A protein has these predicted regions:
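Short glycine-rich, Thr/Ser-proximal phosphate-binding strand/loop in the N-terminal lobe
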Residues: 5-7, 14-63, 229
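Glycine-rich beta-strand-to-loop/alpha-helix junction loops that act as flexible
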Residues: 10-11, 93-96, 209, 320, ...
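Short beta-strand-loop/turn "lid" adjacent to the catalytic site in phosphate-handling enzymes
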Residues: 74-125, 144-146, 153-163
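Phosphate/pyrophosphate-binding loops at sites that engage ATP/ADP/AMP, CoA/4′-phosphopantetheine
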Residues: 76-88, 192-198, 310-321
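Glycine-rich phosphate-binding loop of actin/hexokinase-like ATP-binding domains
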Residues: 153-254
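Catalytic phosphate/nucleotide-handling subdomain of diverse soluble enzymes
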Residues: 218-219, 224-260, 266, 328-358
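Adenine-nucleotide phosphate-binding core of ATP-dependent small-molecule kinases
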Residues: 266, 273-277, 284-316
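Internal helix-turn-beta structural module
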Residues: 296, 300-320, 330-394
């Protein structure tokens, strides 16, 4: 019977899971799936490592299964269907670890209490990340759980990259640039040495482009600057998040439009970005397929902001050796990659159009001074590795 670890990534009305089993000392996915629409029309589906459906259930329209009920179903499924593996722990993606957590940590009640302090900094993610942790602590208190943080990878940034120009009394309360998508960037940094040695050792910008988007500047695989700051609403425009915003806009919304904090939070996190600009969709695929000029405006703004941030991060690096595209848009949209690389020509990026169209791993032209890569991210595998290491050190 081999050891296994479950990785959970919980959202507001869904969660994704992956079951990793140890084979020859390496974690291999043996099952993965998701539970969705937990409060309206719950559905659970699981597939084996080859993609074959091995479990499926629907509860019907109007059912309210909730996270607790879905977790109960998942635990039962794992016991029934993957009994050949011994579950040794659970790894969780937790968006915000603040200043306290610079590496993955074994969870107990005190850790949960500490992490709840960061709910206001990541309202779309943090409370939902913590929900399954608390549920499993109550149901299976002896099962080790490990929290892995999207902020930890960036804690090694130089102080100047983390600071806002605010009074020390505010900074000391934890108002800093934290950066996010760290598990994705950490995974990319971990695989670069075997795929792109120059990118691994040099000055590299990784573009995590998806429904949530950010960019990270690395030197020798270590984060030195990133586009997201105090919250995951900063930086690039995203599916529904506005990205970089003049603080004066928030004051105007309060003083002149009479909006309160909750209304502004909803605007910034749920009604802006690609959805807000286009008025059509938060999904880049929908916008790319549309001939509506508002869709074009949203795409143009997205590309423009990426180009601006490329210049900023290249300045922080003092030059540029490689760029890496990852996440849903970065891995799958040859059109967006072409536009970004075109805008980055002044930095020395030259694209191989055919390689880009084929979604090759290396998409830079032979004449390009800056390497260009497409590397799929794997945050779940990163969490599984961390969870195993923490559990082994107990």
């Amino acid at each position: 019977m081999g050891d296994a670890i479950v990785v959970l990534n919980a959202g507001s009305s869904s969660f994704k899971f992956s079951l990793f089993a140890e084979e020859a000392g390496r974690p291999i996915v043996v099952a993965r799936g998701q539970a969705e629409a937990l409060y309206t029309s719950p559905r659970f589906v699981a597939k084996d490592g080859a993609g074959t459906v091995i479990g499926e259930k629907s509860w019907g329209t109007g059912a309210k299964l909730g996270h607790d009920g879905a977790l109960d179903h998942l635990v039962g499924f794992l016991r029934d269907r993957v009994a050949q593996h011994r579950l040794i722990g659970v790894g969780h993606r937790v968006v915000h670890g603040g200043r306290e957590y610079t590496k993955p940590v074994l969870v107990d009640a005190s850790v949960v209490a500490a992490l709840e302090k960061y709910v206001p900094l990541a309202p779309l993610h943090q409370p939902h990340n913590l929900t399954p942790i608390k549920a499993l602590l109550a149901r299976l208190p002896d099962l080790p759980q490990v929290a892995c943080f999207d902020t930890s990878f960036h804690r090694a940034q130089p102080p100047v990259a983390q600071a806002f120009a605010l009074p020390a009394s505010i900074t000391e309360r934890g108002v800093l640039r934290y950066g996010f998508h760290g598990l994705s960037y950490e995974y990319i940094a971990s695989v670069l040495p075997e795929r792109a040695e120059r990118a691994a050792q040099g000055r590299t910008i990784v573009l995590h482009l998806g429904n949530g988007s950010s960019m990270c500047a690395m030197v020798a695989g270590r984060s030195v600057a990133s586009t997201m700051g105090f919250t995951a609403a900063d930086g690039l425009p995203m599916g529904t998040r506005c990205g970089n915003l003049d603080p004066g806009v928030v004051l105007y919304l309060i003083d002149s439009l009479g909006m309160d904090a909750r209304a502004i939070e909803k605007l910034i996190y749920q009604e802006s970005g690609l959805l807000g600009v286009s008025g059509i969709s938060s999904d880049m695929r929908v916008l790319l397929a549309s001939d509506d000029p508002r869709a074009k405006s949203a795409i143009d703004l997205f590309v423009y902001r990426i180009a601006r941030e490329l210049g900023s991060l290249a300045a922080a690096l003092g030059g540029l050796d490689a760029i890496v595209f990852t996440a849903g848009i970065g891995e799958n949209s040859a059109y967006l990659r072409e536009r970004v690389c075109s805008d980055a020509a002044w930095l020395g990026v030259a694209l191989d159009a055919d390689a880009n169209a084929r979604n090759d791993t290396s998409i830079g032209a032979r004449t390009s001074r800056v390497e260009a890569w497409v590397i799929p991210t794997n945050e779940e595998l990163m969490i599984a590795r961390h969870a195993r290491a923490v559990i082994d050190r107990r």
